[in-house]
Amino acid sequence: MLTVKFKHLDLKPGQRVLDLGCGEGRHVHGFHMVDGINVVGVDIDEPSLAKAREGIEYLDGQNPDTSPTGDTSFMQASAYELPFEDDCFDVVICSEVLEHLDNYPAAILEMRRVLKPGGILGITVPHGWPERMCWRLAPPPGGYPFEPGGHIRIFDDTALKYELVNAGFTFQRKHHAHGLHSPYWWLKCALWDQRDTHWLIKLYHNFLVWDLMKKPILTRFLDAITSPIMGKSVALYFEANEK
């Protein structure tokens, strides 16, 4: 399940891509299948990186006769202090990460530092009003916002856009994603004490997995019409200015 749309990243063979906060590697796995792309997945959590590496091994095992021509690697590092030289990536993405960080402006500055002038940045965060609904349905103490490693803020995407412009980027476009996922999270939050056991939540989860694997026309249509209204995520794309 990809939140960043690769068609907006202007990918070209030989480019170097950074996925900051790659988690278990869903976007890295996508980049891995694009010929000629050299991608580095960075995350602070080593168990997530281990799963991301396993995913690459699985993909290569499924496609033994079509080895990607690019290079894929992973590295454990902090978003506040990336172990890379200035201007060394052509594309940087950071998907569903900033809402977890205490000092997200520092991470934005690091992304600007390592991204080449003219390079593309793709940022995704939870969409404001669906996220607020989650916070209200499972309020503190102990609710949705207070999950270990959970979301510590709700972004206004317009305000975030201007923060990135002030950090040295030119805004290009935005879109929303995962309209069918918001009801699932609302249901989990409404039944917070049973979020891992309730039959209805399990049923909806199975539906989302089925949709992800089968991609039927009906649910693709439903996602297309619901995402602009109640998409779980909003994606913003920028070009890095000259320094």
Question: Which residues fall in each region the model found?
Answer:
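A short acidic, Gly/Pro-enriched loop at the edge of an enzyme's catalytic core
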Residues: 80-91
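Conserved alpha-helix/loop element of class I SAM-dependent methyltransferases that forms part
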Residues: 1-15, 30
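S-adenosyl-L-methionine-dependent methyltransferase catalytic module, highlighting the catalytic core
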Residues: 1, 26, 51, 55-69, ...
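Conserved SAM-binding loop of SAM-dependent methyltransferases across substrates and taxa
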Residues: 24-36
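Conserved class I S-adenosyl-L-methionine
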Residues: 15-23
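Conserved SAM-binding motif I beta-strand of class I
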Residues: 38-43
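Conserved SAM/SAH-binding beta-strand->alpha-helix loop
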Residues: 45-47
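A short beta-strand submotif of the Rossmann-like class I SAM-dependent methyltransferase core
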Residues: 94-97
